[in-house]
Each structure stands twice: as C-alpha cells, then as structure tokens.
C-alpha cells in the first residue's frame, strides 16, 4: 500500500488528473477501475475521480510495489528531478516570492521555455531553485510542476511570473488574461518623441510567411482578417536623436 498526503502546491486539481500524473504509465481505464474497486481511496472513502483535492487530503493506493513501480514511471521522473536539481540556479534573480507565486528577472539571452528538450530555460531554473531550497519534493514533482505564466522573447529581459502552486498558476494566468496585471516594456527608439501617445490600429499575421502587417484603418469587409490593437507609450528620456519609451501593450 502506498500513501500520499496532498501538499498545498498539489491542491485544487481534480483527483483523477492527480492520479494520472502519479501513475503516468497507466491507462485512464486502469485508474478508474482502481477507483471503482476501492483500490484507490481519498480520505479513506471511495472516490470517482471528480473530487477537487485540498491540502492535507490522504490518498491511499492498495497496489503491490511491483504494480506501483510499473505504472508510476518513477525512474523517468526521478531522472528528470535529479537533472533539474543539478542545474545551477544561481542565474535566477528572484524579485518576489510567496507561498503561491515567484517572480524572477529574466536576463536577455535566456529562453522563457525550452524550444528543444536539451534547452535550459527560465522554467528549468525556477524548478531547480525550488528543488534545491526544499520547496518541491520528488513526490510533489510527479503530480504538479510549477510553471511560468507569461513569456518574454529570448532577447528581451524582464519579469516572469511563475505559479508555485496550482492555485498560484491559475490565479496569475487569469489575471494576465483579464489584464488585471498590466504589462509595461522599456525600449529605445530612433527619433525624439516628447508626448504621451495612445495608438489604435489593426494587425494581420501571415502565418506562412511569418510576417505581421499593421494598419491604422480597415474596410468593413476586412474585419475578419485583422485583430484590433492598442499601444500606449510615454517618453522617459530623450537624447541625441533617440528616445527611451515606456510602452503599455
């Protein structure tokens, strides 16, 4: 029998999703069969998998060690965990952290998320940092992996927000979607701009050519092909034909 206590960073997710991550090599039908037969229980009661987990919930799996090892993908998860633990998280510049959220300053040249498996991105540095400080155990890593909520281009430096818990991840993702968290950028442009400006226009992207077209106005029949966009900027400093701008997208 295996027993697990739900941690704060695992809470909030559906029981069946938790189990499918815990038993990553098992089929969904196997997981639901074990629930029906009470070979898997939640707080010593029968469960159907739709329950929302809370911190402190007790999960019991009445499975043999061989069966658990077969379906848990433990070797693969442990290998990934140890690889992350070996990463030097010293490059991570933490500017804010609480129980649910961590905010880092991503330097230019660092990927937000990896493009190929061998990349080490900001996401890996965050996971390494949490593992090294003891905030993410091997068992927790199998069922929930903290992740960044926003992305920046490789050559752009700035703040990245990551959810340490499912609640933190969902809350910040929703805040970014609803724009209750505002995004501001700093850039240097050629030319001397001295007034705050609010621009409105329309954007169309050619996916095949990977080109973007921006126009100030469109005809009614073109509405389906364009997205409305708005940009605000204010001059921060002007010098020798260049302007530093604060841009709100």
Label every PLM stretch briefly.
Residues 1-249:
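RNA pseudouridine synthases
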């Amino acid at each position: 029998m295996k027993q697990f206590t739900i941690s704060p960073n695992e809470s909030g997710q559906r029981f069946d999703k938790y189990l499918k991550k815990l038993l990553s090599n098992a089929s969904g039908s196997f997981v639901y069969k074990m629930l029906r037969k009470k070979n898997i229980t939640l707080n010593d009661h029968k469960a159907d998998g739709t329950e929302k987990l809370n911190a402190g919930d007790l999960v019991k799996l009445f499975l043999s060690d061989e069966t658990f090892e077969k379906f848990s993908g433990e070797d693969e998860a442990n290998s990934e965990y140890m690889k992350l633990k070996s990463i030097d998280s010293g490059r991570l510049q933490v500017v804010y952290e609480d129980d649910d959220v961590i905010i880092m300053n991503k330097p230019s040249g660092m990927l937000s998320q990896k493009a190929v498996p061998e990349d080490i991105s900001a996401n890996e540095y965050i996971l390494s940092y949490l593992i090294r400080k003891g905030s993410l155990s091997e068992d927790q890593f199998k069922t929930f992996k903290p992740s960044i909520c926003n992305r920046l281009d490789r050559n752009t430096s700035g703040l990245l927000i990551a959810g340490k818990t499912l609640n933190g991840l969902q809350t910040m993702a929703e805040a970014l979607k609803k724009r209750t968290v505002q995004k501001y950028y700093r850039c240097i442009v050629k030319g001397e701009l001295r007034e705050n400006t609010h621009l409105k226009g329309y954007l169309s992207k050619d996916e095949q050519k990977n080109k973007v077209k921006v126009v100030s106005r469109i005809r009614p029949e073109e509405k389906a092909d364009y997205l409305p966009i708005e940009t605000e900027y204010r001059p921060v400093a002007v010098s020798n034909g260049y302007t530093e701008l604060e841009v709100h997208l």
